[in-house]
């Protein structure tokens, strides 16, 4: 884990579940270990990104429309307490 003392939201829990799914996949002899890829849409895209950056076994992440706090390049135009989305990511 990268941030062992941090509080986590739903995306972190889902990313943890993805890590366990990768464990299960890698126990199958027909799975190519260096070819694991993730995709997700909206909140699923954010969670796929988080899972991919916290597990080196995931080779490719392809988020779709992951929005604010996800893969989009954006500037914080309004004053907020946190630059991350308030409904799923780090807060």
What are these model-derived regions, one by one?
Residues 28-30, 55:
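Alpha-helix termination/capping residues and helix-transition junctions
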Residues 33, 59-60:
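Secondary-structure boundary/capping signal
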Residues 40-52:
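Glycine-rich nucleophile elbow surrounding the catalytic serine of serine-hydrolase chemistry
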Residues 1-27, 70-77:
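Cap/lid segment of the alpha/beta-hydrolase catalytic domain
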Residues 60-91:
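Mobile cap/lid helix-loop segments that gate and shape the active-site cleft of serine hydrolases
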Residues 30-42:
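Alpha/beta-hydrolase fold nucleophile elbow
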Residues 53-59:
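Conserved hydrolase catalytic core segment
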Residues 13-20, 38-41, 63, 84-91:
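Extended catalytic-interface subdomain
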């Amino acid at each position: 884990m990268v941030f062992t003392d941090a509080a986590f939201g739903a995306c972190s829990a889902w990313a943890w579940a993805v890590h366990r799914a990768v464990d299960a996949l890698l126990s199958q002899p027909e799975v190519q270990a260096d070819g694991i890829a993730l995709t997700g849409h909206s909140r699923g895209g954010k969670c796929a990104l988080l899972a991919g950056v916290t597990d080196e076994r995931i080779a490719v992440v392809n988020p779709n429309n992951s929005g604010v706090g996800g893969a989009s390049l954006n500037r914080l135009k309004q004053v907020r307490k946190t630059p991350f989305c308030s409904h799923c990511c780090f807060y």
